[in-house]
């Protein structure tokens, strides 16, 4: 990390292979100041340093946190982040966008899958465990027989579990199961000495029923019409590289086609649980999302610090198009036995289409003032144009342009230590609000919201101490948010849980500041320790329409997040690992003041290796801690429908066995 001039956490292959549950949602606990919002089966949205979307209901699909897999943008679709056969995961904290085509206000999550190799190799893995867990994965690749210049890697994976919940009404334990498949083919072709091509074809299929929420907050659901949280994404990507005398030309092209179903039993119950009242509501959204991305980069050769070459640079242009269609079907019935005119029935169907074109120009230059001091300058200009229309007659076509950039100074103190300082300006595009009954040319300030801008200041230190027995990385940051985008929701009809209205506004400003500390320590030849700590303080300021939130912390921004762990090599074949991860309390929303409770989860793993085989016995949340990852505040109980806090709880104790074969 000695050349980095920003806060970045890298999770390597060794760590990712050792994790029994192959999904980024589970691994995210290891990254300080990274949180997620799990409203449905899988977490789709992440927050870095307290900034990021928490849901995708009736909102322009903009993402403050970028999410890339193999340079392909899946922002706002984090549920597809399966992590089998992964080379590394990078979490970049703070504004990004001057080195790559994708833009990110709060930070960027980048997943790099395994590349084809010159020699044949592979991995096979089987996992079985409690709650119906059965996972199987196989990945292999190498050179194609007829050509050494053509290599491939094929990855196949399926993950199954019953979802940790039981539906007491139906007597089933699979109404929130997970059935997730990953298929990926990568082909590398060295066409000429200086020209190469990379091809990617993948499909990620999440066939996950969604029966999550309960009236009493338990893991026992009562729904008579469980919903779905399914997603199937087909991806096609092509990268072309050509080396010139002093720089490399890169072309990155991709297409994604995603089908999503988000449906749920909105009353969370059944005729028996609501008796004597009739209270039965269901909502279904069918979404089709297509993206097209084309990016060109020119990347200089690495500077060699001779008098004629003290710089390295990248410049690029990126085009990103997204088209999204939604069909929403809601139905329901409400009846009070004391009302002679009831029950009352409702049914609605609507459709909408959204498209957006984003064109950006970006660049970064590193200038080496001397062998130990590097100055970096980066800039990004982006223009977006979007169109929206729905069956209610609402239509919008907002557009805007935004400018961001970064300046940093990196000083190498010794062969094993460096310090850096950076100032970066990032942005997130604006949008519009629906169902306000306003014309597109209305001057009402609630109709549109503006882009948000964030200026981030960081100072950091990376160092290796005690003959490299200890690695430490520390970052102090301060972020100033201008025109902060804040989402609030209200329920129009208290007897109909399908009548929520969502409103995004620009608060005048907000601040996010804190500390991130990573320590790796080799205590003895057989004992390793790691500690990762995130401290965060956030505020909402000068929001004229919500003066009651003045100075309050932002939603999903815990003050403390941490991961502590120790690994003991008992023998050359056996090892034992124990880690503790946790978060302090945080506000669930900007619409109300309810908070989660702080929690800590302990995980244990025993590993034994024989030749190319590795066997693991593992347990997650070994003390069966009851903790919450999402909360809603509204009324969902007839007949009074009093507002109360409903919480979605995380996974209970989970035990299993994994066998892995490396070949």
Regions found by a protein language model. Give the residues of each.
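N-terminal periplasmic accessory domains that precede
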Residues: 45-47, 91, 103-126, 134, ...
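Surface-exposed extracellular loop regions of Gram-negative outer-membrane beta-barrel proteins
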Residues: 205-218, 321-325, 385-387, 410-458, ...
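Structural signature of Gram-negative outer-membrane beta-barrels, strongest in the C-terminal barrel
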Residues: 188-193, 202, 298, 310-312, ...
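Gram-negative outer-membrane beta-barrel transporters
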Residues: 299-300, 313-316, 368, 372-375, ...
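C-terminal beta-signal and adjacent terminal beta-strands/loops
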Residues: 482, 529, 582-587, 608-663
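Short acidic/polar hinge/loop motifs at secondary-structure boundaries
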Residues: 56-57, 64-95
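Membrane-embedded beta-barrel scaffold of Gram-negative outer-membrane proteins
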Residues: 239-266, 412, 418-424, 450-513, ...
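Transmembrane beta-barrel wall of Gram-negative outer-membrane proteins
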Residues: 121-123, 128-161, 165-208, 232-234, ...
